[in-house]
Amino acid sequence: MQVSVENTSALERRMTIAVPAERVENEVNKRLQQTAKRAKVAGFRPGKVPMSVIRQRFEADARQEAFGDLVQASFYEAIVEQKLNPAGAPAVEPKSFEKGKDLEFVAIFEVFPEFAVAGLESISVERLSAEVTDADLDNMLEVLRKQNVRFEAVERAAEKDDQVNIDFVGKIDGEAFAGGSAKGTQLVLGSGRMIPGFEDGLVGAKAGEERVVNVTFPEDYQNLDLAGKAAEFTITVNSVSAPQLPELNEEFFAQFGIKESTLEGFRAEVRKNMERELRQAIKTKVKNQVMDGLLAANPIEVPKALLENEVNRLRVQAVQQFGGNIKPEQLPAELFEEQAKRRVVLGLIVAEVVKQFELKPDEGKVREMIEEMASAYQEPEQVIAWYLKNDQQMNEVRSVVLEEQVVDTVLQKATVTDKSVSYEEAVKPAQAPAEAE
């Protein structure tokens, strides 16, 4: 078999393969012999059809099948021989497939980029440290109470944080506009749900009162037909309700699946959850900085095939997340290209770090991660047992652990600065999530 390879770009290869005619004819004859055993031809018993008849009737099909199998087999042999690592399926261009002659075809494909991870010493990471204080815990308990607030009707003027039930009609230049009217709307004053000025205009209003509130739609309002325009809303207040925060009692604790009957026990459980969230937030922020550093220090070209595959994956995820009757392929590719490129490049870099430093998942850390995740459930031992008997889930955990080991490896060479911050600052969402596939 003859093979020649042309580099048509940094990652694209044009490989010409010639398979000897003898091998081609052997493959064709093999298929004809198999066909002869089962072919049903009028006038002949099964298995007794002369080969000349078999060849006359079935040679074209046998040759086409042989072509497909030989292209696949010889392409694999060629990339092994040439030590190439394709990043996707090849585009095949037949050149010659005449009887008695060599089978010749061209395979065009991309290869994975070859590179060594560099610049680890140039990466700078700020590693946060924080603790959950009693004040943080008190704030969290208030948040939990507000999330479970109930509203009770009151006979007084509406205040901030009250809930009002309203009917309203909005007009622009004296004309009602689409989407500007509603009846029986529940609105918490100060929630920021309505455009600026709308909620403020209802503070002090009482049930049964009608108010006229003048507002201006923001310049960046999502409905461009309304953006920047002045509007007048006539609002009728049907009722005013004041927030009633639940008591910190056993009934309240049970809403969170916590069996503790005392406030001290509940606080301990909430603190444990906050500490788990804190550890994860700090770990995520460190990981993001490491991944950003790896990207900056290792600019590599991305195979188009990998990028297209990742874009398609993100399209499917978007449809699954947001629903609707849209098909994934209807979503514009450019919406996902930047994220897809980041994920693909990080995946390649992380894989290379694993290879360079000969990393393997630490089974002890795998067990620790499973126990950490299980601790968030009421029956952690059952969760641990479920993971241990589920190979797919175990492999997913191993992948996460291996990625953490990559981060640890980089941190050993990077410049790391420790910084003590508050709980709130530490758990504040990171600006750009790191993603490696």
Curated annotation (Swiss-Prot):
<comment type="function">
    <text>Involved in protein export. Acts as a chaperone by maintaining the newly synthesized protein in an open conformation. Functions as a peptidyl-prolyl cis-trans isomerase.</text>
</comment>
<dbReference type="InterPro" id="IPR005215">
    <property type="entry name" value="Trig_fac"/>
</dbReference>
<dbReference type="GO" id="GO:0015031">
    <property type="term" value="P:protein transport"/>
</dbReference>
<dbReference type="GO" id="GO:0051083">
    <property type="term" value="P:'de novo' cotranslational protein folding"/>
</dbReference>
<dbReference type="InterPro" id="IPR046357">
    <property type="entry name" value="PPIase_dom_sf"/>
</dbReference>
<dbReference type="InterPro" id="IPR008881">
    <property type="entry name" value="Trigger_fac_ribosome-bd_bac"/>
</dbReference>
<dbReference type="GO" id="GO:0051301">
    <property type="term" value="P:cell division"/>
</dbReference>
<keyword id="KW-0697">Rotamase</keyword>
<dbReference type="GO" id="GO:0005737">
    <property type="term" value="C:cytoplasm"/>
</dbReference>
<keyword id="KW-0143">Chaperone</keyword>
<dbReference type="GO" id="GO:0061077">
    <property type="term" value="P:chaperone-mediated protein folding"/>
</dbReference>
<dbReference type="InterPro" id="IPR036611">
    <property type="entry name" value="Trigger_fac_ribosome-bd_sf"/>
</dbReference>
<feature type="domain" description="PPIase FKBP-type">
    <location>
        <begin position="161"/>
        <end position="246"/>
    </location>
</feature>
<dbReference type="GO" id="GO:0044183">
    <property type="term" value="F:protein folding chaperone"/>
</dbReference>
<dbReference type="GO" id="GO:0043022">
    <property type="term" value="F:ribosome binding"/>
</dbReference>
<dbReference type="InterPro" id="IPR001179">
    <property type="entry name" value="PPIase_FKBP_dom"/>
</dbReference>
<keyword id="KW-0413">Isomerase</keyword>
<protein>
    <recommendedName>
        <fullName>Trigger factor</fullName>
        <ecNumber>5.2.1.8</ecNumber>
    </recommendedName>
</protein>
<dbReference type="InterPro" id="IPR027304">
    <property type="entry name" value="Trigger_fact/SurA_dom_sf"/>
</dbReference>
<dbReference type="InterPro" id="IPR008880">
    <property type="entry name" value="Trigger_fac_C"/>
</dbReference>
<dbReference type="GO" id="GO:0043335">
    <property type="term" value="P:protein unfolding"/>
</dbReference>
<dbReference type="Pfam" id="PF05698">
    <property type="entry name" value="Trigger_C"/>
</dbReference>
<dbReference type="InterPro" id="IPR037041">
    <property type="entry name" value="Trigger_fac_C_sf"/>
</dbReference>
<dbReference type="GO" id="GO:0003755">
    <property type="term" value="F:peptidyl-prolyl cis-trans isomerase activity"/>
</dbReference>
<keyword id="KW-0131">Cell cycle</keyword>
<dbReference type="Pfam" id="PF05697">
    <property type="entry name" value="Trigger_N"/>
</dbReference>
<keyword id="KW-0963">Cytoplasm</keyword>
<dbReference type="Pfam" id="PF00254">
    <property type="entry name" value="FKBP_C"/>
</dbReference>
<comment type="similarity">
    <text>Belongs to the FKBP-type PPIase family. Tig subfamily.</text>
</comment>
<keyword id="KW-0132">Cell division</keyword>
